[in-house]
């Protein structure tokens, strides 16, 4: 970049054919070769933007005049003949990235979690009456399935408690110390405390073991009966109460009911996000129902490089598919309440323009048939507030992800169908790949922060369960369309990435349990809050169970048994060991844990195993996945225990992973994360081997899994092993045998997007003419003229230019990007005075040129 010919260098950066670039050079007088103001005036001549003169405050704002011209050079096809362009009140070019706002009121009710306060308010007549919305016919239909659901859930409760009671009784007979009834606390009060401790300690440990066993077995039993009923449901193939059976699947969509596909994102893989979005858009277009749908990308990204990359990817998507005016993009400057706040902001601004909205995750892909089916289900079921599809996991290559894909694809349908069997229209909502009726969502599903202070107060983290509970509290159904195909997602590529996600989910589920006693919640959703907590609380309970069992073994081995527990006891109380009962109970527990997996494979065999690699390979894959789950279960147990304890103590668990180019876990990170588990496993194994080698065999699956945890974590994160399994047709899923066109398109567009990806987005927005024009046109801080604002702008620009680029913080970069004036002034200064800002120029010249033309 030469000071004396900066304008000529600038023209070289414009995406112009050689002939047009030459015409522009000849148009400039030689005296203006180093004058950016003259150049941008020349660029803007003849542009329609001349009708709206930019309110230029100084020569520094010269680049604002040519924003429209530069946009038309780079993305003319995506501007819909200029219809996508507009101006703000100061005449500055602005892209119409979002439709006109039509505001709706959305405010939350205050949480009343204290039942005594609610009782007192009801005495004072302050209760809020229910808000009915059903016709008499609809009420009859709902009462029918609600009665069936209630009966089914009572059956589940009886089965679970009965099974738990029998297992707990067996466990009681297995434990060695059986003299609890002979202990007399009054007698113990008169003897030395050490003797009392020696007598009581084994029985206290046994009591703790028994209580924990009952809780954990009940949890396992509930999962077993859920999977069993799902197996029967899928095997029969008929479900009278399936919501999918309420339409024939080819009804025309009501043109009065429009649907918004909204994708909240935050610092995601930009190339993958927009590849999946394009595949989904084109699939909807192929159904012939595109006019019923709009797409919204709602960004909460706070990485300036990613923000600029998102803007470029959005513009390219609109250009490639002709989606101008139908695909919208918004980046929030004030990130309130995370994902739920992002969705709430959409509902307040544009929600009342739509009857339904489909929530997509950043990795979601949905077929047009699935989306139109969800809309038809909403129209056929006017009492439904949320209909959740059952997303299938696919698209990953690491060994860890392939094991998880296989598990969710083979076992997942049983549990999902089982959940539907027990819950019917009072079901789960998982926060994505689901359709929501917008009006009741706006009226009833705004989330107030949890009252109080501490780690369990403030904005709700896991919003999906709470929104489903509020929707049901308002009288609307929440359904799972478990048999609806065409819904896809991706899983974390390795164990550590999954655990990062689990840390957030753990905290969110623990917070949600504060709503267990909130007024009006349906009992099923209270149970959902409980199961959400148990998903993570079961880990510390299991760990405590193992610790107490180990402590009991230590006491049994090292302490002399107390045979006489009363002063005049005639016969001693002998510790006993009944191995036949222990083996029977252990076998029963294994059956509850692994029979659902075997039933899943039987179901695959019954319906055809070809898409899973064949009958034999499915069985081998089952054994591999079972081995893998056994190795990972103790590792997850310890991590989840740390997450739960940290949440209760208010500790902030920092998890900063090193940057890596692929999904593989480096050895250094593996030993940092799993080192304490390895040491615990070694100490535990050595201690038990010294104490009683027989007990070590019972603990072997636990301790050896901990010892091997770093190695399992590293090797399972490698794509080479996963691809080797794929070549051997192991851990196969139908989406690999016969890939849906949406997933094939996603992979294709992902490769295309990687070829034209934008790295170092902020620097490109400062220097590159096309990217700068895009950033300026999409900047949202569009203030009217004010001297105070001008002073702040000047200070921000000056502070940035007086530093090296790497010294400008992300927050400062975001402020500069958000204002069309500041980002344009940066662009002007670095091109007008390259020798003054040599540090910026040198940093930019090291970067590859951005890909503008497809």
UniProtKB/Swiss-Prot annotation:
Give the family from UniProt: Belongs to the glycosyltransferase 2 family. OpgH subfamily.
- Residues forming coiled coils: none
Q: What is this protein called?
A: Glucans biosynthesis glucosyltransferase H
Give the EC number(s) listed in the UniProt record: 2.4.1.-
| Record GO terms (molecular function) | hexosyltransferase activity
Q: Which UniProt keywords apply?
A: Cell inner membrane, Cell membrane, Glycosyltransferase, Membrane, Transferase, Transmembrane, Transmembrane helix
Q: What does this protein do?
A: Involved in the biosynthesis of osmoregulated periplasmic glucans (OPGs).
Q: In which pathway does it act?
A: Glycan metabolism; osmoregulated periplasmic glucan (OPG) biosynthesis
Q: How does it sit in the membrane?
A: Multi-pass membrane protein
Name the cystine pairs: none
Q: Which Pfam families match?
A: Glycos_transf_2
The species this protein was found in: Pectobacterium carotovorum subsp. carotovorum (strain PC1)
- Where found in the cell? Cell inner membrane
Q: Which SUPFAM superfamilies match?
A: Nucleotide-diphospho-sugar transferases
**One GO location term (cellular component):** plasma membrane
Which Gene Ontology terms describe the biological processes this protein takes part in? glucan biosynthetic process
- The membrane-spanning stretches of this chain are 155-175, 209-229, 528-548, 583-603, 619-639, 671-691, 695-715
Top-level taxon of the source organism: Bacteria
Chief localization: membrane
């Amino acid at each position: 970049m030469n000071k004396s010919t900066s304008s000529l260098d600038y023209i070289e950066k414009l995406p112009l054919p050689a002939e047009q670039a030459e015409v522009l050079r000849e148009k400039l007088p030689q005296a203006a070769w180093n004058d950016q103001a003259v150049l941008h005036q020349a660029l803007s001549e003849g542009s329609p933007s001349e009708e709206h003169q930019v309110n230029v405050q100084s020569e520094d704002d010269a680049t604002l005049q040519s924003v429209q011209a530069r946009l038309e050079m780079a993305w003319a096809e995506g501007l819909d003949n200029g219809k996508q362009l507009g101006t703000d009140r100061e005449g500055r070019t602005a892209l119409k990235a979002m439709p006109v706002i039509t505001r709706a009121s959305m405010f939350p009710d205050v949480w009343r979690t204290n039942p005594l306060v609610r009782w007192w308010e009801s005495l004072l007549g302050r209760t809020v009456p229910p808000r009915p919305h059903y016709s008499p016919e609809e009420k009859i239909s709902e009462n029918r399935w609600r009665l069936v659901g209630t009966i089914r859930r009572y059956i589940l409760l009886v089965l679970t408690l009965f099974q738990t009671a029998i297992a707990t009784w067996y466990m009681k007979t297995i434990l060695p110390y059986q003299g609890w009834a002979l202990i007399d606390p009054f007698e113990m009060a008169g003897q030395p405390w050490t003797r009392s401790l020696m007598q009581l300690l084994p029985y206290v440990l046994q009591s703790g073991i028994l209580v924990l066993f009952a809780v954990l077995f009940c949890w396992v039993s509930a999962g077993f009966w859920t999977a069993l009923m799902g197996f029967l449901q899928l095997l029969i193939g008929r479900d009278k109460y399936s919501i999918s059976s309420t339409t024939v699947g080819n009804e025309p969509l009501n043109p009065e009911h429009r649907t918004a596909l909204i994708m909240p994102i935050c610092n995601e893989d930009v190339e993958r996000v927009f590849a999946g979005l394009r595949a989904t858009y084109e699939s909807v277009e192929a159904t012939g129902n595109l006019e019923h749908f709009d797409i919204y990308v709602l960004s909460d990204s706070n990485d300036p490089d990613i923000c600029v990359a998102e803007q470029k990817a959005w513009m390219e998507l609109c250009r490639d598919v002709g989606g101008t005016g139908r695909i919208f993009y918004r980046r929030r400057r004030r990130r309130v309440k995370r994902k739920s706040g992002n969705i709430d902001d959409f509902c307040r601004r544009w929600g009342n323009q739509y009857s339904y909205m489909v929530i997509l995750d950043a990795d979601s892909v949905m077929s047009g048939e699935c989306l139109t089916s969800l809309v038809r289900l909403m129209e056929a079921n006017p009492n439904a507030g949320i209909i959740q599809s059952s997303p299938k996991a696919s698209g990953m290559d690491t060994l860890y992800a392939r094991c998880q894909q296989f598990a969710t694809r083979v076992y997942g349908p049983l549990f999902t169908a089982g959940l539907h069997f027990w819950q019917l229209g009072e079901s789960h909502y998982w926060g994505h790949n689901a359709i929501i009726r917008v009006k009741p969502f706006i009226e009833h599903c705004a989330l107030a922060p949890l009252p109080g202070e501490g780690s369990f107060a403030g904005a709700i983290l896991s919003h999906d369960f709470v929104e489903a509970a509020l929707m049901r509290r308002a009288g609307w159904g929440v359904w799972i369309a478990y048999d609806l195909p065409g819904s896809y997602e991706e899983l974390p590529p390795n164990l550590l990435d999954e655990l990062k996600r689990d840390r957030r989910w753990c905290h969110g589920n623990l917070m949600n349990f504060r709503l267990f006693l909130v007024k009006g919640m349906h009992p099923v959703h209270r149970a959902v809050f409980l199961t959400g907590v148990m998903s993570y609380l079961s880990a510390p309970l299991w760990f405590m169970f193992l610790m107490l069992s180990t402590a009991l073994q230590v006491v049994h081995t090292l302490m002399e048994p107390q045979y006489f527990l009363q002063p005049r006891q005639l016969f001693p109380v002998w510790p006993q060991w009944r191995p036949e009962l222990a083996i029977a109970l252990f076998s029963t527990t294994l059956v509850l844990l692994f029979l659902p997996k075997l039933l899943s494979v039987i179901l695959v065999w019954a319906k055809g195993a070809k898409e899973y690699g064949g009958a034999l390979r499915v069985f081998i894959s089952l054994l591999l996945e079972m081995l893998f789950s056994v190795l990972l279960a103790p590792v997850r147990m310890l991590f989840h225990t740390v997450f739960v304890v940290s949440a209760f103590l208010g500790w902030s668990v920092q998890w900063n992973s090193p940057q890596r180019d692929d999904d593989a876990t480096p050895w250094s990170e593996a030993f940092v994360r799993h080192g304490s588990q390895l040491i615990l496993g070694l100490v535990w194994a050595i201690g038990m081997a010294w104490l009683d080698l027989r007990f070590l065999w019972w603990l072997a699956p636990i301790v050896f899994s901990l010892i091997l945890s770093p190695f399992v974590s590293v090797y399972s994160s490698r794509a080479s092993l996963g691809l080797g399994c794929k070549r051997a047709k192991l851990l196969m899923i139908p989406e690999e045998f016969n890939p849906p066109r949406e997933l094939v398109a996603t992979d294709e567009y992902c490769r295309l997007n990687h070829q034209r990806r934008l790295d170092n987005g902020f620097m490109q927005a400062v220097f590159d003419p096309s990217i700068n024009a895009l950033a300026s046109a999409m900047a949202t801080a569009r203030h009217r003229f004010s001297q105070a604002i001008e002073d702040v702008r000047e200070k921000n620009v000056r502070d940035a230019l007086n530093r090296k680029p790497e010294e400008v913080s992300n927050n400062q970069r975001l402020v500069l990007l958000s204002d069309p004036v500041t980002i344009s002034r940066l662009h002007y200064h670095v091109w007008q005075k390259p020798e003054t800002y040599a540090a910026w120029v040198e940093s930019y010249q090291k970067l590859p040129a951005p890909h503008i033309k497809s």
